[in-house]
Swiss-Prot record:
Pfam families documented for this protein: Ribosomal_L9_C, Ribosomal_L9_N
Keywords in alphabetical order: Ribonucleoprotein, Ribosomal protein, RNA-binding, rRNA-binding
Protein name: Large ribosomal subunit protein bL9
InterPro entries: Ribosomal_bL9, Ribosomal_bL9/RNase_H1_N, Ribosomal_bL9_bac/chp, Ribosomal_bL9_C, Ribosomal_bL9_C_sf, Ribosomal_bL9_N, Ribosomal_bL9_N_sf
């Protein structure tokens, strides 16, 4: 029997996948609401869902690209002040959370701190490029300037 998975079933199929399974197992999955029979109506509904998902994904990608342009346009530099020693090393460090808060304060742009790909907190003064993963395919760079208080 041909079925369409409505949920992921480990070892058998993923949500939205169409597969041919033995009748007994297919009926079991249908009763569990993990699959439905692949008739013409269900197939067209699945195609519609896939088109909607593709459209939504394209919109998210476009939005991420626009946000990247907005972040990198002009000379946007996040200015931060911190206490530092004589050799230019900071007392403490600058984290992605602080950068996110400062970006929102200065430019009104909200970025989740988890999207910033700082390998380790910033401990030196000067300019630093911080990569931000906005989407699977889109990565922007925020320029951060750390100066002494």
């Amino acid at each position: 029997m041909k079925i369409i998975f409505t949920e992921d079933v480990r070892g058998k199929g993923r949500r939205g996948e169409i597969k041919e399974l033995p009748d007994g197992y297919a009926n079991f999955l249908i009763k569990q609401n993990k699959a439905k029979q692949a008739n013409a109506q269900a197939m067209s509904q699945l195609k519609g869902q896939k088109r909607a998902e593709a459209r939504k994904e394209a919109e998210e990608l476009e939005e991420a690209k626009k946000f990247k342009e907005l972040l990198e346009s002009g000379e946007r530099v996040v200015e931060m002040k911190a206490k530092a020693g004589t050799d230019g090393r900071l007392f403490g460090s600058i984290t992605s959370k602080q950068i996110s808060q400062e970006l929102e304060k200065q430019y009104g742009m909200k970025i989740d701190k988890r999207k910033m790909e700082l390998r380790e907190p910033i401990r030196t003064m000067g300019y630093v490029n911080v990569p931000v993963k906005l989407h699977n395919e889109v990565t922007a760079k925020i320029r951060v300037h750390i100066s002494e208080k």
